Amino acid sequence: MQTPLIDLRNIRKSYGGGDSPQVDVLRGIDLSIHAGEFVAIVGASGSGKSTLMNILGCLDRPTSGEYLFAGENVAHLDSDELAWLRREAFGFVFQGYHLIPSASAQENVEMPAIYAGTPTAERHTRAAALLERLGLASRSGNRPHQLSGGQQQRVSIARALMNGGHIILADEPTGALDSHSGAEVMALLDELASQGHVVILITHDREVAARAKRIIEIRDGEIISDTATSDPSVQLSANAGALQAVDLRQRLADGSEPTGAWKGELLEAIQAAWRVMWINRFRTALTLLGIIIGVASVVVMLAVGEGSKRQVMAQMGAFGSNIIYLSGYSPNPRTPEGIVTLDDVAALANLPQVKRIMAVNGAKAGVRFGNADYMSYVGGNDTNFPEIFNWPVAQGSYFSEADESSAAAVAVIGHKVREKLLKDVANPIGQYILIENVPFQVVGVLSEKGASSGDSDSDDRIAVPYSAASIRLFGDHNPQYVAIAAADASRVKQTEQEIDELMLRMHGGKRDFELTNNAAMIQAEARTQNTLSLMLGAIAAISLLVGGIGVMNIMLMTVRERTREIGIRMATGARQRDILRQFLTEAVMLSVVGGLAGIGVALIIGGILILSEVAVAFSLAAVLGAFACALVTGVIFGFMPARKAARLDPVTALTSE
């Protein structure tokens, strides 16, 4: 005797239990179905026929009993193998059609083949042929809402046949149709049965059930009659035993992981994600806004921080990285600072590693020209100033050694002082300004340097001969500090050590002086700027985090709204990982689009800031980093909703509203 294709032994299905009362839906079902049979399972509403169909189609598991498919116990199959069985053996035709609303008729039909790993061209050809066979060739691009009920049911039948549809499970296929459409659907099922497909028809209508060759009546979860209207063997055809002729376990081993399927599934996931995003454009835009703001904030903040850093570094570096500063120092704030003398300067000038040295005696002082008053830094120094600080004169000339020797009342003004006091004077050279009410003649204007660090503006200064500053302005011959240019920029540290040793000898071993160098100051400023940039980036990253929470929120809502779609995908053969991939792809797509848009917005904002003369320096690493963060955010915050979707029970998902 031929082994049944489907063999149910004492199948029971119960719900509830524990704190709630147990409800027995199926009570000891024994049923065998052979290849090629056209079976109708008929019963009133609540009789358990739909539950039986779900178990037959591997959408649900029985509470107890054995389900043998082609001789293999279905209870021993894992979720992926059950998905393979649904994909390769079964084709579902539901009363409610269960088509994915956002997909076209052809895309709905192709879905089982996507999960089977069928090549794209072959998939398109087969789907088109099935739709043409069912009279829907002209409607292949229409979405479900653009089709009539009968047309939607025919699309559902085409989908059931996409992977062969060896076993067609039709649950009330005519229940939502008018009589004409219902007759067309039943004619199709008759045709499929005559071609050797196993057709299992679930219905409450005895007239519809009469079309089958075998009628099984179920009541209160029990089979009360099983009547064959003709010999099932008459219906067998060449392909009727296709599944039975091979070892199911081998088929599962070979086919539960379709070769190359992931490529088609990924492409379909991307296309589906884009469709969903486009259909829900307004909601998508609001979700993207969080990602866009987050990415744009990170990129712009880091660009502003980097621009500020480069500007400050360039301005500080413009003074030379080989400069060492010497000044008086006291370790105890209650005692006066040590004094650096001109004798110290003379001794240091003889060190072989010292290229140039200059004493500076300066302070803030009131400056007047005409009726304009201004406070600026006035520094007494010598003719080494332009060389030590690499600071040429833009107009006029620097004062000479003769001016220094004679304590001449001459001054070289900075660019900012020129703008503040002599802006309306065509040629400031030769003009007289009052410094602390002492007249000084302007002999030169320094070139523009800009801010050296923080709020300090290097152009806000006036240079006068050291002797003139000491005698005419401050009355103190000792320098405020000493600027020393090392002969070798790569040996600044060693030069500083030599200066330190000499000063200790000259001051009797007393460390009442302090040494700093531009290189160390630049490094310290760089660290400060880096910290500032990180702070700005961290603040901006909070926006990105908020955007990620928005993605998770919208994906959780999407999973809830599309629960039935998840059930449809599972019924057509999607594994848990396929569902996970689908919804994770959607989350990542949101992040990718939001990330790219955020970068675009950041570049626009950066352009506006540059036009506003704000220092901005975009970094490829920062841009890519922000985009990567958006991507990771999408993966992290999209994983939980996607995982929730993947863990849904197929039956629960299909019956959700």
UniProtKB/Swiss-Prot annotation:
Domain of life: Bacteria
Transmembrane spans: 285-305, 532-552, 590-610, 620-640
Principal cellular location given in the protein's record: membrane
InterPro entries, sorted: AAA+_ATPase, ABC3_permease_C, ABC_transporter-like_ATP-bd, ABC_transporter-like_CS, MacB-like_ATP-bd, MacB_PCD, Macrolide_Exporter_MacB, P-loop_NTPase
Keywords from the named record: ATP-binding, Cell inner membrane, Cell membrane, Membrane, Nucleotide-binding, Translocase, Transmembrane, Transmembrane helix, Transport
GO MF term list: ATP binding; ATP hydrolysis activity; transmembrane transporter activity
PROSITE patterns: ABC_TRANSPORTER_1, ABC_TRANSPORTER_2, MACB
Segments forming domain ABC transporter: 6-245
Enzyme class, first EC level, given as a word: translocase
Membrane topology: Multi-pass membrane protein
Location within or outside the cell: Cell inner membrane
UniProt-annotated binding residues for ATP: G43, A44, S45, G46, S47, G48, K49, S50
Record-annotated disulphide pairs: none
One Gene Ontology CC term in the entry: plasma membrane
Gene3D superfamilies xrefs: P-loop containing nucleotide triphosphate hydrolases
Keyword tRNA-binding in annotation: no
Pfam family, one: ABC_tran
Subunit structure: Part of the tripartite efflux system PvdRT-OpmQ, which is composed of an inner membrane component with both ATPase and permease domains, PvdT, a periplasmic membrane fusion protein, PvdR, and an outer membrane component, OpmQ.
Function of the protein: Part of the tripartite efflux system PvdRT-OpmQ required for the secretion into the extracellular milieu of the siderophore pyoverdine (PVD), which is involved in iron acquisition. This subunit binds PVD and drives its secretion by hydrolyzing ATP. The system is responsible for export of newly synthesized PVD after the final steps of biosynthesis have taken place in the periplasm.
The name this protein goes by in its record: Pyoverdine export ATP-binding/permease protein PvdT
Organism, scientific name: Pseudomonas fluorescens (strain ATCC BAA-477 / NRRL B-23932 / Pf-5)
GN (gene name): pvdT
